[in-house]
A protein has these predicted regions:
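A domain-start/cap signature at the N-terminus of enzymes
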Residues: 1-117, 129-135, 201-205, 209, ...
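Short substrate-entry loop that stabilizes the transition state in hydrolases
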Residues: 104-115, 120-159, 234
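Cap/lid segment of the alpha/beta-hydrolase catalytic domain
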Residues: 152-175
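Alpha/beta-hydrolase active-site loop
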Residues: 169-191, 212
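Alpha/beta-hydrolase fold nucleophile elbow
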Residues: 192-204
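Short glycine-enriched nucleophile-adjacent loop
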Residues: 207-219
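A conserved short beta-strand
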Residues: 220-234
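Short beta-strand/loop motif that positions the catalytic acidic residue
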Residues: 278-280, 284
Length: 386
């Protein structure tokens, strides 16, 4: 079913390009040529067996990992395996990359103070190094002084490296979500990172999984940042996942949010809630903007007990086309808990399915701002557990 969703996603993009002549470079990049079999024949899209044998696009997404680390800090690949007997029985092993800014020792004893940790989850057809390069999050971490953890989906688990956010078991916090929770705990202990300042962020399928991680483990995650995310809890299969991406949720927006709100309230008293920033482009044809609106509604329910102002603050920012840092026009809606922003929704004009303000030499990244990485870190830095 995971490969089914990936195939539907790619076929949707092919259909879009047939009907829209004014294509952006991003949308063109989403159209890999048909994979060829070892005998040189194109893999047949209509045959499920052929798709299993020839997962077309995955090899094309791998970029040179050196691009992600032209920085003075530490950038290393590691592998996480569960250590407890109960977890180890699953046999799950997950690769991850970790960036530690310069001056941060691998030994907790040598750190002047514990560093915050941002967990970054890539989207489909990306690797962890791709995502690090595209978002420029490591550069920001070097400037601001925080660690960045990039779990990576394996091509064996999904040919397009998509996270399976639409599966009910995942939505309940099992599978990859539990593996990541254990990974975060291990990485924080090993490197002496701040357990009260751990944040989850992601793009597209990675944003969907970051949402689940935050809502299922509010004792670990202090705040959430999502870019181009599907609404939470509305899918139960690959087919319905694709439908949600295109049309949003039918009826369960409030129901699943209410359940999540009650779970969080019991897991992290007296705070409750889950601080979150939601970023979406108004021309996203992969995960339609209705998802951002519905996810925002869910997060309002989840944060209802902590939001103290009846009215949200709304701001608009004009486009900037000249200078070294061009920006698209965008608007933001902010709900406050006291003086802290508790929930921010940012709608970016003319942006497609791409990380705003990133490295546009990479797939699913747009150079023009606003800078989504900086916006997320600015929001995260206001929140901590305890």
């Amino acid at each position: 079913m995971a490969k089914s969703l990936s195939g539907l996603w790619l076929r949707s993009l092919r259909s879009i390009t047939k009907t829209q002549r004014a294509q952006t470079r991003l949308m063109k990049s989403l159209l890999p040529k048909p994979a060829r079999s070892p005998l040189g024949r194109p893999a047949k899209a209509k045959s499920p067996a052929r798709r299993v044998k020839a997962p077309a696009a995955a090899p094309k997404t791998v970029k040179p990992v050196a691009r992600a680390a032209p920085l003075p800090g530490s950038w290393k690949l590691s592998y996480f395996s569960a250590t407890s007997p109960a977890r180890a029985a699953s046999g799950k092993r997950m690769a991850y990359w970790l960036y530690l800014p310069s001056g941060a020792s691998a030994s907790a004893a040598n750190l002047p103070q514990p560093l915050p940790l941002v967990v970054m989850l890539h989207g489909c057809q990306q690797t962890a190094p791709d995502f690090a390069t595209a978002t420029r999050m490591n550069q920001l971490a070097e400037r601001k002084g925080f660690a960045v953890l990039y779990p990576q989906q394996s091509a064996a688990s999904d040919a397009h490296r998509c996270w399976h956010w639409y599966q009910r078991s995942i939505q309940k916090g099992q599978g990859d979500v539990q593996v990541m929770a254990d990974m975060i705990t291990q990485v924080r202990q090993r490197h002496g990172l701040d357990a009260s300042r751990t944040y989850a962020a992601g793009l597209s399928a990675g944003a969907a999984l970051a949402t689940i991680l935050a809502l299922r483990h509010p004792e670990l995650i202090a705040a959430l940042g999502v870019h181009s995310a599907p609404v939470f809890g509305a899918a139960d299969s690959a087919i319905s996942g694709y439908r949600v991406m295109q049309h949003g949720a039918a009826a369960v927006v409030g129901e699943v949010a209410g359940v999540a709100a009650r779970a969080i309230a019991s897991a992290r008293p007296p705070q409750g809630g889950m601080p979150a920033i939601v970023i979406h482009g108004d021309r996203d044809a992969v995960v339609r903007r209705i998802n951002a609106r519905q996810l925002g509604q869910q997060l309002q329910i989840i944060n209802a007990a902590t939001i103290t102002r009846a009215e949200a603050t709304r701001q608009t920012f004009p486009a900037r086309t000249s200078g070294r840092s061009p920006k698209r026009a965008y608007s933001s809606t902010t709900h406050y808990a006291g003086r802290k922003p508790q929930l921010v929704q940012c709608d970016i004009s003319t942006l497609g399915h791409a990380w705003s303000g990133g490295d546009d030499s990479m797939r699913f990244s747009a150079r023009e701002g606003p800078d989504a990485s900086l916006m997320m870190w600015t929001f995260f830095s206001r929140h901590f557990l305890g």
